[in-house]
């Protein structure tokens, strides 16, 4: 009998994560007057990043419930590895 993996996105403690479209990302960066790498990073190996199928270079919007503000929005830049960058493959 195979066991079905739980969907971590449905857990009550995991906030909503969504990948921004190219247009949304460009607008966000223009509004904040920053480059993507100036956002906080999130690893491509993060379980939620894998679940939403984000790719390196994507920007993720995280929407958390907040008791004081109602909701808090944060953004993360998806990188290959936040601790130890992988070496580029030789072509």
UniProtKB/Swiss-Prot annotation:
Main subcellular localisation: cytoplasm
One GO location term (cellular component): cytoplasm
Broad class of enzyme this protein falls into: transferase
Keyword Transcription: yes
Enzyme Commission number, as recorded: 2.7.7.6
A biological process term (GO) from this entry: transcription elongation by RNA polymerase I
Signal peptide (UniProt feature, chain positions): none
Reaction(s) catalysed (UniProt annotation): RNA(n) + a ribonucleoside 5'-triphosphate = RNA(n+1) + diphosphate
Keyword annotations of the record: Cytoplasm, DNA-directed RNA polymerase, Nucleotidyltransferase, Transcription, Transferase
Subcellular location, record wording: Cytoplasm
Pfam families named in the record: RNA_pol_Rpb5_C (PF01191)
GO molecular function per UniProt: DNA binding; DNA-directed RNA polymerase activity
Domain of life per record: Archaea
NCBIfam families assigned to the protein according to its UniProt record, in alphabetical order: PRK09570.1 (NF007129)
Self-association and partners: Part of the RNA polymerase complex.
PANTHER family: DNA-DIRECTED RNA POLYMERASES I, II, AND III SUBUNIT RPABC1 (PTHR10535:SF0)
Chain's role: DNA-dependent RNA polymerase (RNAP) catalyzes the transcription of DNA into RNA using the four ribonucleoside triphosphates as substrates.
Protein family per UniProt: Belongs to the archaeal Rpo5/eukaryotic RPB5 RNA polymerase subunit family.
Protein name: DNA-directed RNA polymerase subunit Rpo5
Source organism: Staphylothermus marinus (strain ATCC 43588 / DSM 3639 / JCM 9404 / F1)
Gene this protein is translated from: rpo5
């Amino acid at each position: 009998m195979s066991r079905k993996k739980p969907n971590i996105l449905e857990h009550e403690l995991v906030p909503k994560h969504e990948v921004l479209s190219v247009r949304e990302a460009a607008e966000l960066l223009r509004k904040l007057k920053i480059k993507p790498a100036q956002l906080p990073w999130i690893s491509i190996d993060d379980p939620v990043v894998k679940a939403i199928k984000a790719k390196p270079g994507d920007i993720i919007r995280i929407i958390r419930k907040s008791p004081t503000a109602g909701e808090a929005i944060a953004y993360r830049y998806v990188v290959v590895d936040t601790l130890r960058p992988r070496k580029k493959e030789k072509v």
